[in-house]
UniProtKB/Swiss-Prot annotation:
Residues 20-148, 226-283 are annotated as: Disordered. Residues 37-47, 56-91, 99-112 have a biased composition (Acidic residues). This is Putative uncharacterized protein DDB_G0272194. Disulfide bonds: none annotated. GO terms for molecular function: histone acetyltransferase activity. Residues 117-148, 232-283 have a biased composition (Low complexity).
Amino acid sequence: MELLQQYLQQQQEELKIQRELHSSGQSQNAYQQQQQLEDDEEYDDDQLPLSPTQTEEFDYDNDYNDEEFYDEDDDFKEDDDEEEEEEDDEMYPIRQDNNIDDDDYEEDEEEQLLYPTNNNNNTTTTTPYTTYNNNNNNDINNNNNNNTKSEMTMIPTVSSNISLNPLQILEQYLNTQQQIQQKQFQKHQEELQIQQLQQNHPLQLLEQYLQQQQQIQQEQFFNHQRENQVPNSNSNSLNSSNENNNNNVNNNNNIINNNNNSINNNMNNSNNNNNNNNNGNKNPFFLDDFIYI
């Protein structure tokens, strides 16, 4: 047991020593990192990169105190203005001045390769943007020495060949929609004309008449079916009334036939009388004529 306790105490002491070493190592590493960062900052302040236009190292503490960088009103002179213009040209390489020398073109040859331009009549196209110039860009491309700067407007291109502004795109869309509506209206008018012609066609009129007659016949048939579905008493009364009506009709027909027979008899009698009269009058006249002659 004593050996075990001694062994455990040794292990605990070793763990304490390792923890102390580990904590001291971390603090030492943090101190070294902080020291390295401070050294790097000091090195960066001492080793600032030179600008392309500088030939010697710039002293930020002393050079701005020189009188040549200040005028009477404590403003920067033309050198600072030129530097600002160069920075603007680097930020906006598409913008060009009208008064550019040939030397500037030679210096900016790499920029021209990075930003190619297509020369049209009144537009200068680049990728992915198109620049519209209010003046004639041919003056810029031909290096005319004008003292005015071209005013550029950046808008996205519609296609690689044709450049349109948003108003032109909207106008084209409205024109296409108007054409589609006109075609639909014309088609609708043609369909209406065809329907009117079909309705006024004689065959169509005949078909309508036949349909109406068919409806009338169907209604009559249904009415007749309803009448046949009446109870027996009513049907007997109807049959008796129909028989009486038929008898009356037959009697009337007999009367008419009798009248016709009487008329025929009268006509025959009148014809016989006329014949008798004609035969009785002929002999005396002939005898008299014969006697007188």
